[in-house]
């Protein structure tokens, strides 16, 4: 089942012609959800060149090809579903309201026939040359091996830009869309309505933005304005965020954008348990999240495509030390709480991203993300992206991108990380703030220590300021209690900053940069992505980054104090698996 959402708001450019593309690629059926995003009733009528089934609360009907139909979307009725027949490729509709009684054209087009380029990207399926594992070093074998985890083939990496500083991380996204960076004064003033000069902006065919959060704050508004510019020029935009973390103003900003420009397609991810599912699965509906981080811009001009991956979300906490004053902008979020379980929380996070400009790699990562975008809507299953093919020649690429959906791929990411840790011979260097290891990852740590592999961890044991910070701190202390006398654990101690980077380096030649936390959530609950690089030269570039984290940290005392209530709570495996 392919499911896409068309957001309708009578106040969103009410007289402008609009086009919405839907995809039935490799799907047995298609559902187009018409979602009311405004405060005015909407009337829709027209014809399609194929049979169309319509389902609304309390009623349903089927319309023959070329037969006119009419439906209304009241304010109180949040959605109506359209089910186009496989032969249907086009609908010519008019959308009217009290604001535009004459109506405005709305065209629905099937992507497979209307846009061969995006269809080719979305249907890409790569053959990966895999060298004979006989005689290979174990780390190399693990890197090139095929597994159930969704991975690209080994790719060229070029010379990626390493984005350690927060402004550099945000400006990389800005430059990919605007063609130039924002000056320091723009961040100092923190005005989300600042003038933006689009004279150097690239001409883009596709924008992918995948993030845990897309907040209505300075960062989110600037990104929304950049995307809006390209949407007005006809660029196809695909945005993926987590529904359970979006607040009212976040939703309003994104829904308004998608309503004004239907070429901006929005997926708000929410995992739903089966009817009658056990209690723990019902509860996990509240905290399973889409944690894949990527901005990919595919440009028409050579050399201007970019992809950025890592740990940062679209949230001011990744850019500013403290909340900026947005009271002049009532439609933006003014943050308040700095601890607990409130969605109004604010932390200042130290994170790490990587920007890649190699055009083949950018396109490959965008195509890989399409497997998530076009996942089966009912099961969350995604099609494979690559297939291994035995090769005598050594692959030229040094980097592989992965995407994990642990509750659908049999915890394949956990198995991959276990393999990587098991292959370590000398040293493992880790930067990660969340240290609630799964049992299998813990056994891999124990095995590495038994082999006398040196493990160094730069973490953030005290996670006060993060959402649920007190619980996360207790879990980190349990890690220190277990491993403090065997692992060199250091606490990142930049003042009032919460570590958020996720880096793992093995034997001075393999580097993983990802969204993956070393906790149960990442391996059991959340979708994740990252890049694994097997290249000593790239490790040499990353080593100063790691040393900078070490320089901003101090050794952790092993005599931690953990309250009895937390010990009792986390003695239950089900509770630990939730964090």
Each predicted region: which residue ranges?
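Extracellular ectodomain segments of secreted/surface proteins
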Residues: 2-46, 50, 69-71
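Short, hydrophobic beta-strand segments
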Residues: 72-86
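Long, C-terminal catalytic modules of enzymes
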Residues: 495-579
């Amino acid at each position: 089942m392919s499911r896409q959402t068309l957001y309708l708001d009578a106040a969103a450019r009410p007289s402008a012609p609009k086009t919405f593309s839907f995809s039935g690629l490799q799907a047995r059926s298609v559902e187009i959800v018409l979602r009311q995003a405004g405060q005015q009733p909407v009337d829709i009528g027209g014809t399609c060149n194929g049979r169309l089934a319509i389902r609304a609360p309390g009623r349903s009907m089927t319309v023959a090809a070329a037969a006119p139909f009419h439906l209304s979307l009241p304010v109180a009725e949040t959605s109506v579903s359209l089910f186009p027949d496989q032969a249907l490729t086009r609908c010519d509709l008019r959308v009217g309201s009290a604001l535009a009684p004459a109506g405005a054209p709305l065209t629905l087009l099937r992507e497979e026939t209307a846009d061969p380029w995006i269809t080719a990207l979305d249907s890409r399926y790569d053959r990966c040359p895999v060298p004979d594992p006989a005689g290979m070093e174990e780390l190399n074998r693990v890197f090139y091996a095929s597994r159930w985890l969704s991975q690209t083939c080994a790719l060229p990496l070029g010379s990626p830009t390493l984005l350690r500083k927060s402004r550099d991380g945000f400006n990389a996204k800005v430059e990919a869309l605007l063609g130039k960076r924002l000056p320091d004064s723009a961040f100092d003033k923190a005005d989300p309505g600042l003038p933006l000069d689009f004279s150097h902006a690239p001409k883009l065919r596709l924008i992918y933005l995948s993030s845990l959060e897309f907040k209505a704050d300075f960062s989110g508004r600037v990104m929304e304005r950049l995307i809006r510019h390209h949407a007005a020029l006809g660029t196809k935009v695909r945005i993926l965020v987590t529904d359970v973390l979006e607040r009212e103003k976040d939703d309003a900003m994104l829904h308004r954008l998608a309503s004004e420009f239907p070429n901006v397609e929005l997926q708000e991810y929410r995992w739903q348990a089966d009817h009658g599912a056990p209690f723990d699965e019902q509860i996990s509906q509240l905290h399973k999240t889409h944690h894949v981080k990527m901005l990919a811009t595919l440009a028409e001009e050579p050399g201007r495509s970019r992809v950025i991956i890592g740990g940062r979300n679209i949230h001011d906490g990744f850019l500013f030390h403290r909340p900026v004053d947005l009271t002049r902008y009532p439609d933006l979020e003014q943050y308040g709480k700095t601890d607990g379980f409130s969605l109004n929380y604010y932390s200042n996070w130290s994170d790490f991203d990587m920007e890649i400009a190699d055009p083949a790699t950018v396109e490959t990562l965008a195509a890989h993300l399409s497997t998530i975008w076009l996942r089966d809507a009912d099961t969350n299953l995604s099609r494979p992206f690559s297939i291994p093919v035995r090769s005598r020649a050594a692959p030229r690429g040094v980097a592989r991108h992965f995407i994990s959906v642990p509750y659908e791929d049999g915890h394949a990411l956990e198995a991959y990380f276990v393999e990587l840790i098991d292959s370590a011979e000398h040293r493992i260097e880790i930067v990660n703030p969340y240290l609630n290891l799964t049992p299998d990852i813990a056994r891999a740590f124990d095995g590495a220590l038994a082999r006398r592999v040196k493990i160094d961890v730069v973490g953030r044991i005290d996670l006060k300021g993060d959402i649920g910070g007190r619980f996360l701190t207790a879990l980190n202390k349990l890690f220190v209690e277990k491993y403090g006398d065997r692992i060199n654990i250091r606490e990142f101690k930049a003042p009032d900053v919460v570590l958020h980077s996720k880096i793992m380096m093995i034997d001075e030649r393999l580097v993983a940069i990802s969204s993956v936390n070393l906790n149960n959530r990442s391996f059991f609950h959340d979708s994740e992505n990252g890049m694994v690089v097997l290249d000593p030269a790239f490790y040499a570039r990353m080593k100063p980054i790691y040393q900078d984290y070490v320089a901003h940290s101090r050794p952790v005392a092993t005599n931690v104090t953990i309250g009895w209530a937390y010990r009792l709570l986390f003695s239950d495996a089900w509770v630990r698996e939730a964090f």
